[in-house]
Curated annotation (Swiss-Prot):
GO molecular function: DNA binding; DNA-directed RNA polymerase activity; magnesium ion binding; zinc ion binding
Any Pfam family hit: RNA_pol_Rpb1_4
UniProt protein name: DNA-directed RNA polymerase subunit beta'
Cell membrane as UniProt keyword: no
Phylogenetic placement of the source organism: Bacteria, Pseudomonadati, Pseudomonadota, Gammaproteobacteria, Alteromonadales
GO cellular component: DNA-directed RNA polymerase complex
Coiled-coil stretches noted in the UniProt entry, renumbered to this chain: none
Chain ranges passing through the membrane: none
Catalytic activity line of the entry: RNA(n) + a ribonucleoside 5'-triphosphate = RNA(n+1) + diphosphate
Length: 1405
């Protein structure tokens, strides 16, 4: 019978579709969907359990309850298919039509749809240009609204209270019409002529001056245009007919004990039907107005509750005081349709179990318990058993498997061979959380996992569980084997480094083997080959750490694959010689001839992958692991309490620190330092004491003195187990050893502040009660943090994935010449990240020239691999322009050249790769390692921030960047520009260090001078801000009147007097308008000019400036005319960790943002107002000047008369990304966000490639604001997708019309996700109601471009292996041919086929 049904299945086929459109349903459309009107609130008959007629489960409307059987039982069986029973009116067909047939309710009075009423901004309100409150008062029958004023003085849409209405009736009689309720709103909406409104508003727009009014009209215009273009009619926002959901989607399930469980929707529908029927009866009876009104209001409320319960007023609750789940609740939220059933489904053929170690497995294998395998591969086993003739029927096969006869196991072995399974560990934070393995059958019940893949899964064996999934189809097996096999995922997609690096015991074993010791057994022997070494080791002639000489044979592999062998003698140890046996051919012996810590091993694997490729690396990684386990066992490393050696110096160091603290305490009590300073200093003292103790401890641990062969004492690296574990990177760190053998150190309170009494004891000595309490205090905070962090990190990842999910590589090369300028990252003089690491795997955007010549070193469009990077480094190139996804020109995707290398594969990225998701996972996955805390900058850092000089670390030459300077009387340079930087260049022209130097810095060296390491080359006063003279002459005071604009103050200690300019607020009224200044005059008494300009040398003095010179005093170039004291910058918290990353990606505005210059020009200060000063910038080309009000308390970086460039910092603070984009452009904002995000991750030692952050930034920059519409169909001030505007502009330019101009906009990731073109994707992310309301009103069509939309509608995603399928479809839709659908048979053909089959079956009896 099952086979027969196949013929009938083809009746209802899903049409191929290319998009999904959402719109408003008209009453006629709703009626056309419906199969009948639901008139009664009954559900099923309580005795017969049959559905009531015309009720909510009526079989006549919705279809039969049993397959091919009418309700009264007159027609049963297949042969009556399609007949409608004359007794009960039920069509004989399959039950599943009850999942798709809808009904309807004819409403006795129209009802407003709550989504279009209450979802802000209210669409109905915007359409009618009325406030939401007014409309609600009409809808809920509190006031009348005028619909047709006629010849009266009333206006259309005017609100009338009951009294007003009665007065108007008396006055005008029936000349006017006013109504209440949804009917009134319906008539108002129906009366709107969309086209006329649009024309009126478009004419009105240009003449409007008020900003708010323009915004309001633009909003309304957009809405009306959306209606007009989509063909929706405004009156459809009011329901006249209510559709009824098919009954099987709101089932009534019998529980045991005769009770029923029902879906909340049934209650809600029942309520609507009851009220509707009562209203019909009242209308028939012509009941009094007030009763009818009340009933209509109740109907409106019950429909509201059905559509979106709790949106207005209190939510309707069921019998158990729980709000009922309405239609809107069904689709939104984590438990809603989108996230629960469409994006995350449960799958069949899966199992889960605890994992244990499989140290004997190969990298591509996993151990699968026989029991699990038998269950998972059942259908395959049945098939095999039947195929081999061991079982006659499936039923027999089933019996065999249940009895577990021996043949079954042989078959299972066969089935499993070369059939990969997928292992997944939750939480799956990145794509390496699911990998494929070949199963190996094992006894027991735990899955065995290869130790090297633990890092990718972040798994350990303390009870973690993993899930197994079986890829069933051939295609799935192929993908699992070729793409997801653990051996194909050696490199991490986040940073391109090996992710299958050994850890813990393996590292310890390899490290132990490769160490050397003085005077080991067999030291100084020389061996002819590695085989001999092994023999000596096995026969115990030579110890594993002994230093020996040995002849090694190395294979070099040339570019073309030719192999040459060479031999040489190396100094090494027995252990390293043994390790080199597993080294693949083609790698140098030097790679193992060193202490093999975790970093070295990782580098070794990386080199192996780059030089020899995947296969050798996989084999090598396995061998390394086996060797590591073996030698770790041999080493017998263990930890005893005596391994934690406490340094003798500890006690004196602690005593010294305590004495210092006492001294500060005394200073505090005598009032010399403030409480804050005392606290900071105390913490500093303890922090440095802690450092010293741990230094002494590590020095003590790390070396030991032994007797060498000559009988003399010699220092050697210690073989202390704890030290070895930390040094090799196997487990633990100096910070942890410090707590065991040094001192526990400072602890933090739960709020993050540091407790000033540290724990001076360590764990070996033991803690006393108060120390123990403080310890637990901090530890508990750590646990609470971790729990919060996980949730926050997961949410960040979800937002990132959502914003980037539809970004896919869709073409080879977009041909752009744009790119980002890459320089080495230098912080405080150290190169944090050399240029090589930043450009590796990128494509060059413009030819790189050899320094000092015109010769092209790296041609454009070269993919920089390791070899090219070597060339770049040799030629000491310190900046280059590389392609980036941010500047990629491809529409709706990116090109391979702008992305560069696929980090996980090491070649240029393939088309169809979902780079957006990879980027989001790479940024989100380490999120759990980031801290949650904001860092309190305590003493140490605040002291560092008040630096006052630059001390060089390397030899080199001095170079200045964007610096203006003058030479003072003693021949030193004085910097007179802001944001100047000073760099040190080595002899090859590479930049080694770079420092920011403030205005007024005095340089000890001239530009291009040689500097030595450790020299101090620049000084400045961190506490005051000088005003430097740029010419020599005499001082002339302007507007400097004692007691009016300035005062004289005498210093008590030195007796010197100085002039202090008064703040505007303190001056008498005569001085309010005066502008105190210093003017420089020459010997002839005329004003001097600033060199090279026509600007007189006049320096305006702000309030509180201190002038050291007197009137008419001579002055030299570079001397300070005045000093402005700087308030000591308050120690402010810097947000760090996860919250900082989230803030950057959400593009949040900082609390006190830096103020940037909006234009280039000259600064002057206009009239001051209360609490604010007016900053005026006059452009050099004489354009309109720009004014801005700035609060007085902001510290300004600029003086009157100074020139600024657009985007320069005027007042310090955190820079807002929006400002950087507006004033400095897209590349600068990209650099800013990339560097800021990287700073957070770098602090935690996490490496992420810049590319991933750039991908997210590209998505944040997707939208733009139209500044001038030109001849396009956009509106000025409208937000649009950049790709759309570019495409439109290309068309306009081709026609010779004026294109639209636009300004890029930066959106935070949440906003950007909600602003995508695809409403399905946005609705499944957040704010489902709002997204769907907006989409419906605009009649939006979702083209199913992204990944998420396709997952939701159940198709292959347009990325990876599904990419070509989508390419083919798109090409066909473009040319107009249809993809071949499944063969469709008409019902009559199917019936014929069936009859034939039945005859055959019948004749074979």
């Amino acid at each position: 019978m099952k086979d027969l049904l196949k013929f009938l299945k083809q009746q209802s086929k899903t049409e191929e579709f290319n998009g999904i459109k959402i719109g408003l349903a008209s009453p006629d459309l709703i009626r056309s969907w419906s199969f009948g009107e639901v008139k009664k609130p009954e559900t099923i008959n309580y005795r017969t359990f049959k559905p009531e007629r015309e009720g909510l489960f009526c079989a006549r409307i919705f279809g039969p309850v049993k397959d091919y059987e009418c309700l009264c039982g007159k027609y049963k069986r297949l042969k009556h298919r399609g007949v409608i029973c004359e007794k009960c009116g039920v069509e004989v067909t399959q039950t599943k039509v009850r999942r798709e047939r809808m009904g309807h309710i004819d409403l006795a009075s129209p009802v407003a749809h709550i989504w279009f009423l209450k979802s802000l901004p209210s669409r109905i309100g915007l359409m009618l240009d009325m406030t939401l409150r007014d409309i609600e008062r009409v809808l809920y029958f509190e006031s009348f609204v005028v619909i047709e004023p006629g010849m009266t003085s009333l206006e259309r849409g005017q609100m009338l209270t009951e009294e007003n209405y009665l007065d108007a009736l008396e006055e005008y009689g029936d000349e006017f019409e006013a109504k209440m309720g949804a009917e009134a709103v319906l008539e108002l909406l129906r009366a709107i002529d969309l086209e006329k409104e649009i024309d009126m508003m478009r004419e009105e727009l240009p003449s409007i001056n008020s900003e708010t009014r323009r915004k309001k009209i633009t909003k309304r215009l957009k809405l009306i245009e959306a209606f007009f273009q989509s063909g929706n009619k405004p009156e459809w926002m009011i329901l006249k007919v209510l559709p009824v959901l098919p009954p099987d989607l709101r089932p009534l399930v019998p529980l045991d004990g005769g009770r029923f469980a029902t879906s909340d929707l049934n209650d809600l529908y029942r309520r609507v039907i009851n009220r509707n029927n009562r209203l019909k009866r009242l209308l028939d009876l012509a009941a009094p107005d007030i009763i009818v009104r009340n009933e209509k209001r109740m109907l409106q409320e019950s429909v509201d509750a059905l559509l979106d319960n709790g949106r207005r007023g209190r939510a309707i609750t069921g019998s158990n005081k729980r709000p009922l789940k309405s239609l809107a609740d069904m689709i939104k939220g984590k438990q809603g349709r989108f996230r629960q059933n469409l994006l995350g489904k449960r799958v069949d053929y899966s199992g889960r179990s605890v994992i244990t170690v499989g140290p004997t497995l190969r990298l591509h294998q996993c151990g699968l318990p026989k029991k699990m395998a038998l269950e998972l591969f059942k259908p395959f086993i049945y098939g095999k058993l039947e195929g081999r003739g061991l079982a006659t029927t499936i039923k027999a096969a089933k019996k065999m498997v249940e009895r577990e006869v021996p043949e079954v196991w042989d078959v299972l072995d066969d089935v499993i061979r070369e059939h990969p399974v997928m292992l997944n560990r939750a939480p799956t934070l990145h794509r390496l959380g699911i990998q494929a393995f070949e199963p190996v059958l094992i006894e027991g019940k735990a899955i065995q996992l290869h130790p090297l893949v633990c890092a990718a899964y972040n798994a350990d064996f303390d009870g973690d569980q993993m899930a197994v999934h079986v890829p069933l189809t051939l295609e799935a097996q192929l993908e699992a084997r070729s793409l997801m096999m653990s051996t194909n995922n050696i490199l991490s997609p986040a940073n391109g480094e090996p992710v299958i690096t050994p850890s813990q015991d393996v590292v310890l074993g390899l490290y132990y083997t490769s160490r050397e010791c003085v005077n080991g057994k067999g030291e100084g022997m020389a061996f002819e080959s590695i085989d001999e070494v092994e023999k000596a080791y096995r026969t115990k002639v030579a110890a594993i750490h002994a230093r020996i000489k040995v002849r090694v044979t190395e294979t070099q592999i040339a570019e073309n694959g030719e192999r040459t062998e060479s031999r040489r003698i190396v100094d090494t140890t027995v252990g390293r010689a043994l390790l080199s046996r597993i080294l693949p051919k083609g790698l140098s012996y030097d790679l193992v001839n060193q202490n093999m810590g975790k970093k070295q091993i990782s580098k070794l694997l990386n080199t192996c992958y780059r030089q020899l490729g995947l296969k050798d690396t996989v084999i090598f990684a396995d061998q390394l692991m086996y060797a590591g386990f073996h030698y770790a066992t041999v080493s017998g490393a263990s930890v005893g309490i005596n391994d934690m050696v406490i340094p003798d110096e500890k006690y004196t160091l602690v005593a010294d620190a305590e004495a210092e603290v006492l001294e500060i305490q005394e200073q505090f009590q005598s009032g010399l330092v403030t409480a804050g300073e005392r606290y900071n200093k105390v913490i500093d003292i303890w922090a440095s004491a802690n450092e010293k103790v741990s230094k002494a401890m590590m020095a003590n641990l790390s070396s030991e003195t032994v007797i060498n062969r000559d009988g003399e004492e010699e220092e050697q690296e210690s073989f202390n187990s704890i030290y070895m574990m930390a040094d090799s990177g196997a487990r633990g760190s100096a910070a942890q050893i410090r707590q065991l053998a040094g001192m526990r150190g400072l602890m933090a309170k739960p709020d993050g502040s540091i407790i000033e009494t540290p724990i001076t004891a360590n764990f070996r000595e033991g803690l006393n009660v108060s120390q123990y309490f403080i310890s637990t205090h901090g530890a508990r905070k750590g646990l609470a943090d971790t729990a919060l962090k996980t949730a926050n990190s997961g949410y960040l990842t979800r937002r990132l994935v959502d914003v980037a999910q539809d970004l896919v590589v869709i073409e080879e090369d977009c041909g752009t010449f744009e790119g980002l300028t890459m320089k080495p990252l230098i912080e405080g003089g150290d190169v944090v990240e050399p240029l090589r690491e930043r450009v590796l795997g990128r494509v060059v955007a413009q030819d790189v020239l050899k320094p000092g010549t015109e010769e092209v070193l790296v041609p454009r469009n070269t993919l920089l691999d390791e070899a090219w990077c070597d060339i770049v480094e040799e030629n000491s190139i310190d900046e280059m322009i590389v392609r980036s996804v941010i500047s990629c020109d491809t529409d709706f995707g990116v090109c391979a050249a702008c992305y560069g290398r696929d980090l996980a594969r090491g070649h240029i990225i393939n088309q169809g790769e979902a780079i957006g998701v990879v980027a989001a996972q790479s940024i989100g996955e380490p999120g759990t390692q980031l801290t949650m805390r904001t860092f309190h900058i305590g003493g140490a850092a605040s002291r560092a921030s008040a630096e006052n000089n630059v001390q060089v670390k390397n030899l080199g030459t001095l170079k200045l960047h964007n610096a203006k300077y003058v030479t003072n009387s003693v021949g030193k340079l004085v910097i007179v520009s802001r944001s100047s930087e000073l760099a040190i260049i080595d002899e090859l022209g590479r930049e080694k260090e770079r420092y920011k130097v403030p205005y007024g810095t005095v340089l000890e060296k001239l530009e291009d001078d040689a500097v030595a390491a450790g020299e101090i080359i620049a000084n400045w006063d961190p506490h005051t801000h000088p005003i430097v003279s740029e010419v020599a002459g005499s001082i002339k005071f302007v507007d400097m009147i004692e007691g009016v604009t300035m005062t004289r103050q005498t210093d008590e200690l030195t007796g010197l007097s100085s002039i202090v300019v008064m703040e505007v607020g303190q001056r008498p009224s005569a001085g309010k308008e005066m502008r105190p200044a210093i003017c420089l005059i020459g010997a002839d008494g005329n004003d001097l000019m600033i060199p090279g300009t026509e600007v007189p040398a006049q320096y305006f003095l702000p309030g509180n400036a201190i002038v050291a010179q007197d009137d008419n005093a001579p002055i030299n170039v570079g001397d300070a005319l005045a000093r402005i004291p700087q308030e000591s910058s308050k120690t402010r918290d810097i947000t760090g960790g996860l919250p900082r990353v989230a803030d950057l990606f959400e593009a949040r505005k900082p609390k006190e943002p830096a103020i940037l210059a909006e234009h280039s020009g000259t600064i002057s200060f206009g009239k001051e107002t209360k609490g604010k000063r007016r900053l005026v910038i006059t452009p050099a080309d004489g354009g309109d000047h720009y004014e801005e009000m700035i609060p007085k308390w902001r510290n300004l970086n600029v003086f009157e008369g100074e020139k600024v460039e657009r985007g320069e910092v005027i007042a310090d603070g955190a820079e807002a990304a929006h400002d950087i984009l507006r004033l400095r452009g897209i590349h600068k904002v990209a650099n800013y966000i990339v560097n800021e995000v990287q700073d957070v991750y770098r602090l935690q030692g996490v490496k992420i490639n810049d590319k991933h952050i750039e991908v997210i930034i590209r998505q944040m920059l997707r939208k733009c604001e139209i500044t001038n519409a030109g001849d396009s169909e956009f509106l000025a001030g409208e937000q649009a997708e950049v790709s759309r505007v570019k495409i439109a502009n290309r068309e306009l330019e081709a026609q010779g019309k004026q294109p639209a101009t636009f300004e890029r906009e930066l959106l935070g990731i949440t906003k950007a996700s909600l602003a995508t073109e695809s409403f399905i994707s946005a609705a499944s992310f957040q704010e489902t109601t709002r997204v769907l309301t907006e989409a419906a009103v605009g009649g939006k069509s979702d083209k199913l471009r992204g990944l998420k939309e396709n997952v939701i509608v159940g198709r292959l995603i347009p990325a990876g292996t599904g990419y070509s399928y989508h390419q083919k479809r798109n090409a066909e839709t473009a040319t107009g041919t249809d993809t071949e659908a499944a063969p469709v048979i008409s019902a009559s053909e199917a019936e014929q086929n069936l009859a034939d089959l039945l005859n055959l079956a019948g004749s074979s009896d």
